[in-house]
Amino acid sequence: MKTYIVIFTTLILLISCEKEDFNEGNIRIDKELIMQLNSKSYDTLIIESNKLVLDAYLWRDFMPISPPDGKTMISINWLRDIDSTEILDNIGLIEQYVIYNDSIWIAEYENETSTTQPDYKIKKRSREGPKWGPNICVDVISKICDSNSNNDYYIKIKDIYVERTD
């Protein structure tokens, strides 16, 4: 009987423990990582002759061909020079972090290039995100690489509304 009580108590304790770092695919619950990302990211970033900001558009598709609970999130990010100066070739968008409460969607950008963007913008897309929202606000942080210096930088934009497309 004592064995059952010990096993039962142990199970209860394990189940009730708070999970600080939960991973599900590319979605994490990690308050510490969110604090680290926020502490090293900037609203405006200056790299050589470029003064850069991040723009973002996120949505979930609820078109009739979509599942009843909608498709996963899609994100488009633009790195933009605020003076419309051509962005140097050594600067690139590498990875994005979409933050909602204590959860983070971490995604590398798709390997597509846009020929329709002006020289002062870089456009990158990520798919297969979480099914958060729609009609919520998230923060977006992007990891940028400067291949000349081999330095990574982080740039952010806050309170981006996640749209619903029908």
Protein language model features and the residues they cover:
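Surface-exposed edge beta-strand/loop patches
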Residues: E20-T44, R125-D166
